[in-house]
């Protein structure tokens, strides 16, 4: 997908809580769309992008009771967590900006990852 096919959203909030670098790069975190009440069912992806490369990375949903506890008024956020594993040989070395994709909406997380 071209970046133009995603809708820029200021309603997406979240964080990458853990980055584990080994044979794989494992990222764990969470994000929601604060303007939606359908967060448990959202498709979440990450985009790694720099001036040369862009990678769209699928994630696996993960239960996050801590996010639900922090937002008790939001019953739709318990499954807003994600985990993804990236084989190092599948991504070129470099510094990447990380974007959160929630369904077809995108937001720059402010996070950079060095591979």
Short names for language-model regions:
Residues 1-115:
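Basic, ligand-binding patches in group-transfer machinery
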């Amino acid at each position: 997908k071209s970046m133009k096919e995603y809708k820029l959203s200021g309603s997406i909030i979240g964080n990458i809580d853990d980055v584990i670098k080994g044979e794989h790069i494992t990222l764990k975190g969470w994000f929601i769309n604060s303007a939606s009440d359908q967060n448990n069912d959202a498709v979440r992806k990450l985009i790694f992008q720099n001036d040369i490369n862009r990678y769209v990375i699928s994630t696996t949903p993960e239960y996050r009771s801590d996010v639900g506890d922090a937002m008790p008024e939001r019953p739709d956020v318990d499954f807003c967590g994600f985990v993804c594993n990236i084989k190092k040989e599948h991504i070129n070395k470099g510094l990447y900006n990380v974007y959160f994709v929630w369904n077809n909406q995108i937001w720059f997380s402010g996070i950079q990852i060095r591979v």
